[in-house]
């Protein structure tokens, strides 16, 4: 009895210690329990204390892209969106274990928060919307301060949470990074540990987070999805295809984000290979209606480019681009000489007179 009381007091003291505030950010407070995240961010400084070899840079870059696939192909397209199916639960568990090596929590945690983002995208309930909270919060501070947001609530996964092995893996997600660290140290000592785990992981974190932040700010919108998701070819390189983010928000339930042959999607190519090997058994594809709408919107954008400058075109919504082309077909002209505000006012007037039907948001 006395022992249990002491343990309870120790637990309470430990809880209070973890809640000690360290510093404030715009929408919350970073506390002591976030210290591992901060220290891990600082750990790449050890590159100055180990011998340098170019093979170490190759190791960091190689593990960045290998584990980026674990995030994009496993955590995102499988656990978050069920874009494909696998042969059995053992493969599913191994996939989850590989995903934990990315040091981004367990598969259930990751999928839960990502589904929450899609459900409330760009609203004040969206935990990492740059529209609502700005760049840095959407990029990295959201997951250390989200529990300070009174509007945040957990999104229950009723599909994958039924598997006890995945719940176990989610609770003990540190196993993956520990196994990776031990393997790296065993192969190449401290230099491999620093470059292969510390440097590579911090780069991987920020590469992953660009989709939350930059892909909702920079790029082109092919679809009207009710949010600010964009297609960004540069980010598609860094994230093995995830940069086609507006495509993804238009149709989430597939294995590919690059909808057309010219939109490189390394994640999809690798999943296709695993499909041929029999590991992946079924791959979801975007329906023809979505692809047809994308082609139509691209054609409208090309036509609109002849009417207004590139800068103006980038500030118009998908619906406004369609209205612009429609107005030009009806005889309206001289849009190129007008400013963005003037064009938007004209298009708003046209919308009131003759509303155009557009694709409903599928985000």
Each PLM stretch: what is its role?
Residues 157-164, 218-244, 248-251:
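Active-site-proximal inter-transmembrane loops
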Residues 1-210, 214, 254-363:
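Non-catalytic, topology-defining segments of multipass membrane proteins
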């Amino acid at each position: 009895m006395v022992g249990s009381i002491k343990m309870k007091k120790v637990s309470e003291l430990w809880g209070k210690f973890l809640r000690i505030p360290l510093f404030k950010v715009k929408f919350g407070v970073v506390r002591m329990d976030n210290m591992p995240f901060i220290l891990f961010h600082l750990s790449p400084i050890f590159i100055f204390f180990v011998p340098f070899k170019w093979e170490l840079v190759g190791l960091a870059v190689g593990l960045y892209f290998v584990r980026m696939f674990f995030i994009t192909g496993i955590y995102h397209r499988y656990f978050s969106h069920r874009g494909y199916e696998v042969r059995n639960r053992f493969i599913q568990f191994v996939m989850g274990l590989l995903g934990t090596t990315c040091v981004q929590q367990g598969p259930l945690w990751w999928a839960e928060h990502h589904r929450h983002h899609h459900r409330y995208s760009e609203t004040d309930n969206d935990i990492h919307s740059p529209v609502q909270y700005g760049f840095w919060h959407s990029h990295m501070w959201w997951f250390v301060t989200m529990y300070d947001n009174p509007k945040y609530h957990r999104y229950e996964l009723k599909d994958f949470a039924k598997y006890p092995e995945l719940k176990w893996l989610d609770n003990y997600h540190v196993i993956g990074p520990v196994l990776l660290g031990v393997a790296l140290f065993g192969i190449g000592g401290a230099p491999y540990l620093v470059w292969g785990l510390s440097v590579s992981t911090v780069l991987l974190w920020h590469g992953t987070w660009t989709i939350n932040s930059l892909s909702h700010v920079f790029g082109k919108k092919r679809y009207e999805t009710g949010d600010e998701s964009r297609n960004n070819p540069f980010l598609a390189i860094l994230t093995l295809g995830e940069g086609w983010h507006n495509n993804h928000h238009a149709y989430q339930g597939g294995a590919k984000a690059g909808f057309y042959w010219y939109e490189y999607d390394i994640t999809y190519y690798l999943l296709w290979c695993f499909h041929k090997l029999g590991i992946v058994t079924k791959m979801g594809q975007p329906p023809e209606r979505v692809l047809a709408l994308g082609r139509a919107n691209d054609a409208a954008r090309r036509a609109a480019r002849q009417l207004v400058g590139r800068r103006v075109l980038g500030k118009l919504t998908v619906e406004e681009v369609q209205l612009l082309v429609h107005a030009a077909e009806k005889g309206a002209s001289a849009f190129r000489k007008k400013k963005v505000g003037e064009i938007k006012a004209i298009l708003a007037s046209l919308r009131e007179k003759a509303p155009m039907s557009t694709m409903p948001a599928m985000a």
